[in-house]
Design a protein with these regions (language model features):
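Active-site PLP-lysine loop of aminotransferase-like
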Residues: 107, 140, 159-175
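Active-site glycine-centered loops adjacent to acidic/histidine catalytic or metal-binding residues
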Residues: 137
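Conserved core of the PLP fold type I
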Residues: 1-131, 142-143, 148-160
Length: 175
């Protein structure tokens, strides 16, 4: 598990070094997401999860089966075949304070469209101001850019900005 933490948070991460990250092994991405959904239901009652439009279809099933309330937020803009950054930020700002957002760390499934580092910083800033919780699903580290470090930038930006985050890290597709 320690090597997985280093891959996600960085070889020289202070949080990895000081042991302040809790980590458990589960059954791939689906199992990790289900574990987070169960955690949310039990320890974050009343907290709605916001899921990108579109998303991997199992995300909705996992949170539904765990009994969690869910909603969606804009992500992909069909007309440009790119990120709907303005719509995404607007939806994050309009969500009730303390909501949870399921974010794809890289290689968004199914679009493959990812925010730039600058856009991730803005998303982090808006989420911090609203006291939102970020849950990252990272199934494709190394596939988006060909660089595992670059593909982990979203998570690292949020941690650097002082967020407490959760991460579902899977190696089913990149090993």
């Amino acid at each position: 598990v320690q090597q997985s933490l280093k891959l996600a948070f960085g070889e020289n991460s202070a949080h990895v070094a000081d042991g302040s990250i809790a980590a458990v092994q589960s059954l791939s991405g689906t199992g990790s997401c289900r574990l987070m959904a169960e955690f949310q239901r039990r320890f974050m009652p009343g907290c709605k999860v916001y899921i990108t439009v579109p998303t991997w279809s199992n995300h909705h099933n996992i949170w539904r089966d765990a009994g969690c309330e869910q909603d969606t937020f804009r992500y992909y803009k069909e007309s440009t075949r790119g990120l709907d950054f303005e719509g995404m930020v607007e939806d994050i700002q309009n969500a009730p304070d303390g909501s949870m957002f399921l974010l794809h760390a890289c290689a968004h499934n199914p679009t493959g469209v990812d925010p730039s580092a600058e856009q991730w910083r803005e998303i982090s800033k808006v989420m911090k101001a609203k006291n939102h919780f970020a849950f990252f699903d990272m199934a494709y580290q190394g596939f988006a850019s060909g660089d595992c470090e670059r593909d982990a930038q979203a998570i690292r930006i949020f941690v650097e900005d002082g967020h407490k985050v959760a991460l579902a890290q899977s190696f089913a597709k990149n090993m």
